[in-house]
Amino acid sequence: MSIILWSFFLFFTIILSSLTNITTLASFSSLHADELNALKEIATTLGIKRLNLRDEDPCSSKTLKIIQEVDFVPNLDINNTIGCDCSFNNNTICRITELALKTMSLRGKLPPELTKLPYLKSIELCRNYLSGTIPMEWAKMAYLTSISVCANNLSGNLPAGLQNFKNLTFLGVEGNQFSGPIPDELGNLTSLTGLELASNKFTGILPGTLARLVNLERVRICDNNFTGIIPAYIGNWTRLQKLHLYASGLTGPIPDAVVRLENLLELSLSDTTGIKSFPNLSSKGLKRLILRNVGLSGPIPSYIWNLTDLKILDLSFNKLNGIVQGVQNPPKNIYLTGNLLSGNIESGGLLNSQSYIDLSYNNFSWSSSCQKGSTINTYQSSYSKNNLTGLPPCAVPANCKKYQRFLHINCGGEEVSIRNSLGKITYQTDNSRQTNAASNQQFDYWGVSNTGDFTDDNSDHDEYYTSTNLTLSGDYPDLYKTARRSALSLVYYAFCLENGNYNVKLHFMEIQFSDKEVYSRLGRRIFDVYVQGKLFLRDFNINKEANGNMKPVIKEINATVTNHMLEIRLYWAGKGTTLIPKRGNYGPLISAISLCHSQEPLCGVEKTKHHIKYPLILGASGALVTIVLLAVGIYARGIYRRDNNRRERDLRAQGLQTVCFSWRQLQTATNNFDQANKLGEGGFGSVFKGELSDGTIIAVKQLSSKSSQGNREFVNEIGMISGLNHPNLVKLYGCCVERDQLLLVYEYMENNSLALALFGQNSLKLDWAARQKICVGIARGLEFLHDGSAMRMVHRDIKTTNVLLDTDLNAKISDFGLARLHEAEHTHISTKVAGTIGYMAPEYALWGQLTEKADVYSFGVVAMEIVSGKSNTKQQGNADSVSLINWALTLQQTGDILEIVDRMLEGEFNRSEAVRMIKVALVCTNSSPSLRPTMSEAVKMLEGEIEITQVMSDPGIYGHDWSISKLRDIDTHSSSSTSGVTDQTTTTMKSSVSGCDLYPLYPESMILNSTVENSSSSL
């Protein structure tokens, strides 16, 4: 018996010892020394400043201990994960198989040193600020199956060497700056199951080699610039479950082979053309079907309502007609807005569901007692008109008791009061949290209609407002702490308005992309803005317009109200990033809205009441003196007011809400226009520095009494400047029209003019980054004048003295005294020449032909002066060089183009940016106007978004040397600067452009409504 017990004891001892040894081996397994050293190199390339590998083995902690910089902002979305296989060398050695460093704002490059982790299977580096491209060295990693580098600053072409990544099953490069065509070699990655190329700058047609990718299950190629039709070979991807093509650039029709894909769960296609008939989709398991703004016509096929798994159906902004009925189990989200659907929707059963349903902009009929559901959007859904066109009978009061002339809304926020020099303005609250995917909320004189859900965020509880706790700068920061947003379409409409002309101000600030998280700067929110059904802003990007996040930008437009309603629509056309700072962040966003009748100068200002006690005047003689004095005062005041009212009528005629300063205010601000405060001479007269009582520093332009311009030109300048708000235009605060004085009040620019910064005796030391920023800023300002403002405008005198610099060296264009409205129907205006020799385009100076291309020429000269630090008005280079531009052309031919770069930079400049700026300057100063780019194209060239067209030298009569010489002759021998041109204005009609708008937010349904109403009323 004892032998048996002893045997059992020995057996259990051996088993226990074995288990202890295994545990000991596992506990002492550690990362291979080579890979430990490799991590240090990888961290350096990624831009990690300090990496702690001493305290704990990475495979044990399953993370990298990174010591962040001081300004690092903690982020709950950070994913810092290391995956290891510790089965090597009898479970004592670990090898890294997975590396995830996501949402960390790393600023380095993709590390080729990852090849020193030979067992690596997965690379995840999303949401950083990494630059460069995908290293071809990674192809050596035999086990690599997944590359995810979304939301970075990677650029260039996708490398053709991708074919060497033979085992790759997932490639995700969404949200970068990749450009060029997709390489044919991508079709060799036949193991791919996931391919995400969205939100880049890819161009060209999709190569036919992609037909080989038969294992693909999900594809995202949205928000690119592809060309051609949707390829039929997508039908080869028989395992495909998710296909997202919105705003890709591809056009219809949808090939039959694609329609027959049976495993499709999600099909998203939007904002394109060529898809006229509804596809007969084979997949019965569809969960998401988006065919938005693609040109569909005819009725909605009945099989759609029988797809039991369908959760999201978006058929908005097409030409679908017919009746919607027989719907038993509708999808959770249905968007039918902007079609021609008709019938009595109340009898169809659709409204009895719990779905979110958008019926806006259709031709449905409603009873007078129609019920408004909290999840049903009925705005503009009926052809039954009432006194407020387009709203269902139950949606508005029978009659407007009072007509309003102004409205202020704090979008997404509480009631806010702001103060300006005239008094207090109150912005109404818009903080209702009842907004949903298909809602129409209505208040006393306005309403807001919302369409769409953020499908990418995988959440059933979307929020349609946002806010920030950060301290904001700029004027009236309280207006920008909140904002309302939408996933597709956001409409603000005002009703019971007095008819007439209105000034509409739209306030924007990007508060969802924070500069504190570096990767968030890469976010691009792009949407379109329509006012009264007309496209006002296409591809509007708040960040780009404001030159950064958390900066305000105001867009103004003049609109006409004829039916007591005004409508503002913001629409997402599928462009921009959708995954920064996280999935589901896209679509329009707006902070505040203000609209004011042109004959309402106070625009809702609440006047402060002053109570004045008048002393009792005793005695008849005292009363008589008082009466006489009053009579004289009234007479004098009448003369003054008559003159002042005339000027104010001129201002009102232009629909302005300019702040009027008193003479006493400006006299006090400038210390009685003390010469010590004189800044210089402007286009009309002297300019003085001043300080208002609230501490605001201003620049006051005192118009010369000898100026030939006078009141009309004064009003003209106010008319053009006051309606323009842009970060790169000098802001006009207001004016003064007292005591026969005409004064303009501008923001004060601390660093004076660009001319002084470049050529002055005490010139600023502008480094290359400042010069690049200044040049791009000028370009953006001109782009706005030409194409971004409500009225297109030619400046006519762009030069370095008319570019001012603020404290942060932001460039702002000044002196619009020479500007002329550029009517959209005129190709050129021949008028008196007014400008500066050395900056004027040849066709303008010699023949008086004025187009935007004259400003483009002047900008090219200024750009060359910025890069060179030299003035174009002085001879440069050798004796054969007539001008700075001519010298640059000579250097380009000899291959010494960088010799023109300012030596003050001492070689410290970005060579590629310098070459780009020089080439842009040269193409802008082409002697032929037709060969110059537009300012919009020039901006994209400067930012590297498009190629720079080759400069064509012209030895003929328009040649640069001949033109400059002739201009100097004119400057010497002519004082009138008219070049023999009369001041008669001659016009030539502009040729029409392609008529089809891809984003018809007023589709035929709305046009037909208007036509029917107008025709019936004329009978």
UniProtKB/Swiss-Prot annotation:
Residues in domain Protein kinase? 673-946
| Pfam families recorded | LRR_1 (PF00560), Malectin (PF11721), PK_Tyr_Ser-Thr (PF07714)
* LRR-type repeats, residues: 93-117, 118-141, 143-165, 166-189, 190-212, 214-236, 237-261, 263-283, 284-307, 308-330, 332-351, 352-374, 375-398
- The gene for this chain is RFK1
Membrane topology type, per the record?
A: Single-pass type I membrane protein
The family line of this record is: Belongs to the protein kinase superfamily. Ser/Thr protein kinase family.
Major location (coarse) = membrane
* Compartments, as annotated in UniProt: Cell membrane
Residues exposed to the Cytoplasmic side: 637-1019
Can you state which reaction this protein catalyses?
L-seryl-[protein] + ATP = O-phospho-L-seryl-[protein] + ADP + H(+); L-threonyl-[protein] + ATP = O-phospho-L-threonyl-[protein] + ADP + H(+)
Alphabetic keyword roster = ATP-binding, Cell membrane, Glycoprotein, Kinase, Leucine-rich repeat, Membrane, Nucleotide-binding, Phosphoprotein, Receptor, Repeat, Serine/threonine-protein kinase, Signal, Transferase, Transmembrane, Transmembrane helix
**GO CC entries:** plasma membrane
* Residues carrying sugar: 21, 79, 90, 153, 167, 188, 225, 236, 280, 306, 363, 387, 469, 558
Tell me one GO molecular function of this protein.
Answer: protein serine kinase activity
- Give start-end of the signal peptide: 1-19
Give the Phosphothreonine positions (modified residues): 831, 836
Instruction: Supply the name of the protein.
Output: Probable LRR receptor-like serine/threonine-protein kinase At1g29720
